[in-house]
Every structure is written in structure tokens, then in C-alpha cells.
Amino acid sequence: MAQTRFSRVAAGVLILAAVQVGGAAPARAEAPPVAYVGLKYDLVRHGLDKGYVFRTFDDPRSQFLPDVVRKIAFLRKESPDIYAKFLTPAVAAQGRAYLAAHQATLNRAATQFGVAPEVIVAILTVESGLGNNAGKYPVFNVFASLAVMDSPEIIQDLDLDAVGRDRLKKKAAWARRELQVFLEYCAAHRLDPFSYCGSWAGAMGFCQFLPSSLKSCGVSANGKGPVDLFTHDDAIFSIACYLHKSGFQRQNRASWRRAVYGYNHSDAYVDTVITLAEWY
């Protein structure tokens, strides 16, 4: 029997863990699906230059990542246990050392946006190990792959019920929006879209921002831009901006939880970040 696109996926797909973005090897690639043709024209219809879009997809670095699609298709609810590794004396010591090393930048960001430096560092700790683990998946390839996962050639090979198929269609629409924003940003600033790597879900930089978050909350610490989320200064300022826009008030501890929850809709994540901030 002929193998389908996903029957060729290697067994033993990695267990998902959003906080372990760099621990896995990049997903293997396959030939681009036919659905990429429609995706390219969709991006052009929404305002991107046709030549730019076609050149990007025709680049030899452009690859379809079936493993990433499968991860999203069969996404499991995270276990609170995945955050236990952060609540240790060693991690707390690393956070305090980071606070001391980046004190000037943290204080400037905290003053400008009215947030707590300790919360910024706690988020950086969980998201990327203070910048040491930002992910290895090419961001363009992730979003391009996810953007077509609702196409018949792909979805038919996934054994999903009606609820699963509906969720996949919503995630594909989300990925198309994120891809549009990502390419718009790269084109506007003349950045190589293949130079960005991140998590299997497309989050990038030390702060693990999605392209839409980069657009709305990305801040250049020196005010010159473009924003580089793979630098400590810009990641710190961008997190501070995100928390501020999420309602963070330094003197209102209840607002801390609400703002951090806006960063990641997980009670266990919020508990971990707040606990680390208190330890710092």
C-alpha cells in the first residue's frame, strides 16, 4: 500500500512541552505540499509583494515540516509537572545572577513600563532559560507548514474526529495570520526570514514572542530598531511592554497574575513565574 504523507512520519513523536523549545532536534522536512501554491497567492492578496513571497517559498531553505503539523494536530494538554524543574535553588541563583548582570536594562524597562524586573527575569527563565534555549525550528517553515495543515492532502492523512478537524482549521487560519505578520516584518526591515529560529509552535527569541506579539509589543531598547528578540536588552524591553499592555501594575499583585496569564494561558505557568519572581 502506498504510504501517505503522515504514515511516513517517524515513530516516537516527541512529547510536547512548550517550555522545552530547544531540547529537540529540528523536525525533518518533506517536499512542499500542493497547498503551498494557494498559500502564496493568499499572502499576496493580503498585501505582500508577489515577487518577495515567491522568492521566499522557492528558497532552498523553505521546507515543509510534517512532524510539526502532527505535534499541533495531536497537541496534549500540558502537565503542571513540566514546570517543576524551574523551582529549584539552582535556577533561583541563576535568576538572581541575571538580575545583577542586567540590572541597568531591567531598571530602565521597569521604570518605563511600570513593571517588576523580577517578573521579567522569571518569564525569561521559563521561556528560554534566560536566553540559552530559544529553539531550533525555522520560524518561516513552522508557520508555512501549519498554515496549510487544513488542506485536504494533509488533513485526510490525520485520523481526527470532527472536533479535531475543526480545531485544526482554526489553528491553520491562526498560522496564516502569523505568517503574514512575520513576512511583513521581515520585508519591511529587510531581514532574512530564514535567519529566525524558535519553538515548534513558532515562538521566537529569548522572550518567545509570536510574530503578532513582536508587532504589537516588540521594543528596541536603544530606540533605533529593528527589534532583535535574540538580544537581552530588546527581549527585556519587549516583555516589559507586553506586561504593561496586559494590565500589569507594580503595586497591585493581583494584576501580576492576570498579566502573566496573558503571556501564557496556563495557571501552572503563572504560578511558576510568580514564585520565581518572589525568590529573585
Question: What role is predicted for each listed range?
Answer:
Residues 10-20:
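Bacterial N-terminal signal peptides
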Residues 2-11:
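Bacterial N-terminal signal peptides that target proteins for export
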Residues 48-280:
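Catalytic glycan-binding domains that act on GlcNAc-containing polysaccharides
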Residues 23-29:
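Sec/Tat signal peptide C-region and signal peptidase I cleavage site
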